[in-house]
């Protein structure tokens, strides 16, 4: 690399180098500031959970319902699909018929996967194996206050 090439390289990329230096410097400054200025607890109960001044009850690890993961999967699937289709729609003139065919194949593969997941029941909000069957009561309870005469 000659001197003029390295000078040109520096001239073109100096702003990025300053940005990286500033970002790493700011991270280091915040970490060091928290280390030196932050308080330290030296009590025995340092690692005990604190619940509004009372002793904690039960475990802090709660089991999340699978419905939350299902919503997250829907979001990721349709977000990525929308991202690719948006990029395709922006460049539709440049891609021509070949791009249209590729986007159609992409959509068909996604639809095939979606229909497969619906068919096997992977996207059911309440799967049939976990839904409770409510039976009718065998005894009818009279709750009105009329007395027999």
Swiss-Prot record:
Membrane topology field: Multi-pass membrane protein
Record-level Gene Ontology MF annotations: NADH dehydrogenase (ubiquinone) activity; NADH:ubiquinone reductase (non-electrogenic) activity; quinone binding
Reaction(s) catalysed by this chain's protein: a quinone + NADH + 5 H(+)(in) = a quinol + NAD(+) + 4 H(+)(out)
InterPro entries per record: NAD(P)H_OxRDtase_bac/plastid, NADH_UbQ/plastoQ_OxRdtase_su3, NDAH_ubi_oxred_su3_sf
UniProt entry tagged with the keyword RNA-binding: no
Keywords on record: Cell inner membrane, Cell membrane, Membrane, NAD, Quinone, Translocase, Transmembrane, Transmembrane helix, Transport, Ubiquinone
EC number annotated for this UniProt entry: 7.1.1.-
UniProt subcellular location: Cell inner membrane
Transmembrane segments: 16-36, 68-88, 98-118
Primary localization: membrane
GO cellular component: NADH dehydrogenase complex; plasma membrane
Gene3D superfamilies: NADH:ubiquinone/plastoquinone oxidoreductase, chain 3
Stored Pfam families: Oxidored_q4
Function description: NDH-1 shuttles electrons from NADH, via FMN and iron-sulfur (Fe-S) centers, to quinones in the respiratory chain. The immediate electron acceptor for the enzyme in this species is believed to be ubiquinone. Couples the redox reaction to proton translocation (for every two electrons transferred, four hydrogen ions are translocated across the cytoplasmic membrane), and thus conserves the redox energy in a proton gradient.
Entry-linked HAMAP family: NDH1_NuoA
Oligomeric and partner information: NDH-1 is composed of 13 different subunits. Subunits NuoA, H, J, K, L, M, N constitute the membrane sector of the complex.
PANTHER family noted in UniProt: NADH-QUINONE OXIDOREDUCTASE SUBUNIT A, NADH-UBIQUINONE OXIDOREDUCTASE CHAIN 3
Family the entry assigns: Belongs to the complex I subunit 3 family.
Protein name per the record: NADH-quinone oxidoreductase subunit A
Source organism (scientific name): Photorhabdus laumondii subsp. laumondii (strain DSM 15139 / CIP 105565 / TT01)
GN (gene name): nuoA
């Amino acid at each position: 690399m000659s001197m003029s090439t390295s000078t040109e390289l520096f001239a073109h990329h100096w702003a990025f180098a300053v940005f990286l230096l500033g970002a790493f410097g700011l991270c280091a400054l915040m970490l060091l500031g928290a280390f030196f200025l932050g308080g330290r607890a030296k009590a025995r109960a340092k690692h005990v959970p604190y619940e509004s001044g009372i002793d904690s009850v039960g475990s802090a690890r709660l089991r999340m319902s699978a419905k939350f993961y299902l919503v997250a999967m829907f979001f990721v699937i349709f977000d990525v699909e929308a991202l690719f289709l948006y990029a395709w729609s922006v460049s539709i003139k440049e891609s021509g018929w070949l791009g249209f065919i590729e986007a159609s194949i992409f959509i068909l593969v996604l639809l095939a996967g979606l229909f497969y997941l619906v068919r096997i029941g992977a996207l059911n909000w309440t799967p049939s194996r976990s839904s409770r069957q409510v039976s009718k009561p065998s005894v009818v309870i009279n709750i009105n206050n009329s007395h027999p005469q």
